[in-house]
Amino acid sequence: MNQPSSLAADLRGAWHAQAQSHPLITLGLAASAAGVVLLLVAGIVNALTGENRVHVGYAVLGGAAGFAATALGALMALGLRAISARTQDAMLGFAAGMMLAASAFSLILPGLDAAGTIVGPGPAAAAVVALGLGLGVLLMLGLDYFTPHEHERTGHQGPEAARVNRVWLFVLTIILHNLPEGMAIGVSFATGDLRIGLPLTSAIAIQDVPEGLAVALALRAVGLPIGRAVLVAVASGLMEPLGALVGVGISSGFALAYPISMGLAAGAMIFVVSHEVIPETHRNGHETTATVGLMAGFALMMFLDTALG
């Protein structure tokens, strides 16, 4: 009966040990988390007053679109007994391509433009966005390091992961994956510019469909009944509207908060793609199929950005 409290105590001890053994990662997580909190505090009042309330509404609707797409993909698992590993890797590669292109076309480039109007074009603008990129990478690196989770190829990751139920490990992995997507949606609507928000939200929603399906099938593979696996996969999509609120909050406080937050969201998404998604698509020897899927997703996002931007 003391197992949960024992696990919590062990996690606290493991976190302390990891912090001592890897001080740079710990410092990076602390710095990035502090930066996010400061941006959020600075922006929360501004985001909820005046015309910015409309921007919050856009962000929530965008996050809801991501949630609905995840739910649609998860529900598709009810009619599928299984899909081949090659098909799954192609779908995840497609999602990775859309995330990479969204990071470039809908976050980094608009971030550079926004920073250029504040500090002037050139190296100064690039430095502002690069600061955000660094914060995003440090945030996700720290969360990845200190959060127990599991990957199909590398197994248990993070402190005390071997003692946590496999279903919860997958859920934590999904949370780590969906949070930056939701943040990106929120940041893209921070100024109310639909030319930035719509392409990015469309891209994330499109790639959320195969992701939702893959999550439901993965949860079924670790032992959950199909109905419960679908429900958990659907619920995982709630991180997107929650992340969208965080995203619009951190980017609405002051002028430089917007380009910094664009870089932060891009850095977080690129980290997830490189650290999580692409390695998973290569685990079964389907690198070529996954790469073709990635390029198709990248091209589609480029088209969406041109057509809707």
UniProtKB/Swiss-Prot annotation:
It is a multi-pass membrane protein. Zn(2+) 2 binds at H177, E276. Changing E240A: Loses metal binding at M2 but does not lead to significant changes in either overall structure or metal coordination at M1. Residues 51-55, 120-121, 191-192, 252-255, 309 are extracellular. Zn(2+) 3 binds at D144, H275. Signal peptide: none annotated. The chain crosses the membrane at residues 23-50, 56-81, 84-119, 122-145, 166-190, 193-222, 225-251, 256-275, 288-308. Keywords: Cadmium, Cell inner membrane, Cell membrane, Ion transport, Membrane, Transmembrane, Transmembrane helix, Transport, Zinc, Zinc transport. Cd(2+) 3 binds at D144, H275. Changing D208A: Loses metal binding at M2 but does not lead to significant changes in either overall structure or metal coordination at M1. It is found in: Cell inner membrane. Pfam families: Zip. Cd(2+) 1 binds at M99, H177, E181, Q207, E211. Residues 1-22, 82-83, 146-165, 223-224, 276-287 are periplasmic. Homodimer. Also exists as a monomer. Selective electrodiffusional channel that mediates the uptake of Zn(2+). Exploits in vivo zinc concentration gradients (maintained by cellular zinc homeostasis) to passively move zinc ions into the cytoplasm. ZIPB-mediated zinc flux is dependent upon pH, but independent of the proton motive force. Is also able to import Cd(2+), but is not permeable to Co(2+), Cu(2+), Fe(2+), Mn(2+) and Ni(2+). Has an additional transmembrane segment in the N-terminus compared to many other ZIP family members. This extra helix is important for activity in vivo. The two metal binding sites M1 and M2 that are halfway through the membrane form a binuclear metal center. The multiple conserved zinc-binding sites (M1,M5, M6 and M3) appear to constitute a route of zinc release to the cytoplasm. M1 is the primary transport site essential for activity, whereas M2 plays an auxiliary role presumably by serving as an additional transport site and modulating the properties of the primary transport site. Cd(2+) at M1 can readily be replaced by externally added Zn(2+), whereas Cd(2+) at M2 cannot. The zinc flux through ZIPB is extremely slow in comparison with typical ion channels and is nonsaturating with respect to a zinc concentration up to 2 mM. This is Zinc transporter ZIPB. It comes from Bordetella bronchiseptica (strain ATCC BAA-588 / NCTC 13252 / RB50).
